[in-house]
Amino acid sequence: MIKNPKVLILTAHYGNGHVQVAKTLEQTFRQKGIKDVIVCDLFGESHPVITDITKYLYLKSYTIGKELYRLFYYGVEKIYDKKIASWYANFGRKRLKLLLQAEKPDIVINTFPIIAVPELKKQTGISIPVYNVLTDFCVHKIWIHREVDRYFVATDHVKKVMVDIGVPAEQIVETGIPIRSSFELKINSDIIYNKYQLCKNKKILLIVAGAHGVLGSVKELCQSFMSVPDLQVVVVCGKNEALKQDLLGLQEKNPDALKVFGYVENIDELFRVTSCMITKPGGITLSEAAALQVPVILYKPVPGQENENAMYFERKGAAVVIRDDSEVFAKTEALLQDDMKLLQMKEAMKSIYRPEPADHIVDTILAENHVEPNHIPIKSPALAQSFT
């Protein structure tokens, strides 16, 4: 039995999702009395220049680099076993060995497909349990390694795919993707309407525009949607200050029809009152939408994991996927007018959702390592003025 285990969570800053999952798991461990938890961006610390270049290319995949990313994602999948594995397995190894020697963790968790630890286990025989937490509704071979002790996945579909490529079923646990605890709390929606100055008697369209050019022609779209009767449009610009300033002029013309925000800390509040949401199909965003049963319109998925996520939600009836700019307004307006379709999409989201995934993952890891959790009650956060 490990009395006070040290937990090392390895992640990477490609998008916010992997890091967000790592932080959620860290918080969950701490809530259960496990205080010695370290989160490390192994790639960023090991090869900062290469990491900056690849992060830049990743962000460009949203605009000019879609075909390049398609070739990378699906090409690596095909040749991974033959050519890429040995090189990738040693990426970050020097930093990893120093980290393991200095910190001596009892448990290692990956929220990004980093196989340096299982490869080190294979080559040196070190005994340390390794867990992979997959952050999408699909699986890429780069996540798979014989020395990984257990995989935590979003759905039974992902589990079946992994079994088909040779992963033993008993090593895979269907938990859902960890999301922030705020998405699983009960909140009085009246407070939210008042806080964001929204009208309870109108439908609300939430557009999560983000900072990376995810959604094109946002201003033109807002102008079109503002003409729809009994509709309020809420745009979250994230850290895209230029977009926010561009849209504030529109808001001044008709503040009842358009609300513009920058970064919103408690974005779950807006999820709770929206009729549907236009967003990109990241695994964490979709998991959060499923938790609160928000119908989603997925805008031009990038080839790779985003496209796989989008196709899964589309098959399940939880999403409308738009691949052409000219379709955005018409398909969104049609959905907003179809209450039966919106209800069906909510039910589909409910069927996808797995409750308390972070707790499920952490409890499983602690039980397997014979650790008795010491639960620390967490109070529900107040609705603070946490937006810009």
UniProtKB/Swiss-Prot annotation:
Pfam families for this protein:
Glyco_tran_28_C (PF04101), MGDG_synth (PF06925)
Main localization category: membrane
The entry's keywords? Carbohydrate metabolism, Cell membrane, Glycosyltransferase, Lipid biosynthesis, Lipid metabolism, Membrane, Transferase
Question: Annotated Gene Ontology MF terms?
Answer: 1,2-diacylglycerol 3-glucosyltransferase activity
Pathway annotation = Glycolipid metabolism; diglucosyl-diacylglycerol biosynthesis
The record's section on InterPro entries has: Diacylglyc_glucosyltr_N (IPR009695), Glyco_trans_28_C (IPR007235), Glycosyltransf_28_UgtP (IPR050519), Pro_diacylglycrl_glcsylTrfase (IPR023589)
Q: Which GO terms describe its cellular component?
A: plasma membrane
Can you tell which superkingdom this protein's organism belongs to? Bacteria
Its EC number is: 2.4.1.315
- Catalytic activity of the protein: a 1,2-diacyl-3-O-(beta-D-glucopyranosyl)-sn-glycerol + UDP-alpha-D-glucose = a 1,2-diacyl-3-O-(beta-D-Glc-(1->6)-beta-D-Glc)-sn-glycerol + UDP + H(+); a 1,2-diacyl-3-O-(beta-D-Glc-(1->6)-beta-D-Glc)-sn-glycerol + UDP-alpha-D-glucose = a 1,2-diacyl-3-O-(beta-D-Glc-(1->6)-beta-D-Glc-(1->6)-beta-D-Glc)-sn-glycerol + UDP + H(+); a 1,2-diacyl-sn-glycerol + UDP-alpha-D-glucose = a 1,2-diacyl-3-O-(beta-D-glucopyranosyl)-sn-glycerol + UDP + H(+)
- What CDD domains has UniProt attached to this entry? GT28_Beta-DGS-like
- Where does the record say this protein resides? Cell membrane
Tell me the GO BP annotations in alphabetical order.
enterobacterial common antigen biosynthetic process; glycolipid biosynthetic process; lipoteichoic acid biosynthetic process
Family, as annotated: Belongs to the glycosyltransferase 28 family. UgtP subfamily.
- Which HAMAP family does the record associate with it? Diacylglyc_glucosyltr
Stated role: Processive glucosyltransferase involved in the biosynthesis of both the bilayer- and non-bilayer-forming membrane glucolipids. Is able to successively transfer up to three glucosyl residues to diacylglycerol (DAG), thereby catalyzing the formation of beta-monoglucosyl-DAG (3-O-(beta-D-glucopyranosyl)-1,2-diacyl-sn-glycerol), beta-diglucosyl-DAG (3-O-(beta-D-glucopyranosyl-beta-(1->6)-D-glucopyranosyl)-1,2-diacyl-sn-glycerol) and beta-triglucosyl-DAG (3-O-(beta-D-glucopyranosyl-beta-(1->6)-D-glucopyranosyl-beta-(1->6)-D-glucopyranosyl)-1,2-diacyl-sn-glycerol).
What name does UniProt use for this protein? Processive diacylglycerol beta-glucosyltransferase
Q: Which organism is it from?
A: Bacillus cereus (strain ATCC 10987 / NRS 248)
